Regions:
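All-alpha prenyltransferase/terpene-synthase fold signal
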Residues: 1-159
């Protein structure tokens, strides 16, 4: 399952960093729990945006060509959504293990032409909102403002 993979990998890094930061700052246990939720949801949103950028990002700004998830056989969110929506070009490119460049191009074009990118952005925003909700239990401060800004930076990341 996509979310379980993301939770165990990318989101766990955000989760752990947020938890350790709250602990070292002397936060109350209930606030540490909220920080857990913040980090987990922010990490999920980050990975979803990263998956989107692998399709629509600019290679020079990303530092790598687009379509690497497809080439490497990684089940990135736009790929999963395209396959669920019945896109045969994406399904074939993903299933073959080592897609040719024409297959990658066709699959990426199909993903861009469909609704998958918008669906993935909507999902990423949902997790970003959940991260922000977790911060509302913290008293207003420049630190909370900074954590809120990080969420917005992740969502607005556009290469």
């Amino acid at each position: 399952d996509y979310l379980e993979i993301v939770k165990r990998k990318t989101a766990s890094l955000f989760h752990t960093g947020a938890r350790v930061g709250a602990y070292l700052a002397g936060a109350a246990p209930s606030l540490i729990d909220e920080t857990d939720r913040y980090g987990l949801n922010m990490g999920i949103a980050f990975q979803m945006i990263d998956d989107i950028l692998d399709v629509v990002g600019h290679p020079d700004l990303l530092g790598k060509p687009t379509g690497m998830d497809l080439r490497d056989g990684n089940p990135a969110l736009p790929i999963i959504l395209a396959i669920r929506n019945g896109d045969l070009a994406v399904q074939q490119a993903f299933d073959c293990g080592t897609p040719s460049e024409p297959q990658v191009f066709a699959a990426l074009s199909a993903i861009k032409a469909g609704s998958c990118i918008q669906e993935a952005r909507t999902l990423s925003r949902r997790y970003a909102r959940e991260a922000l909700v977790s911060l509302k239990r913290f008293p207003p401060s420049k630190y909370r403002d900074g954590l809120e800004s990080l969420v917005q930076l992740i969502i607005d990341r556009d290469f």
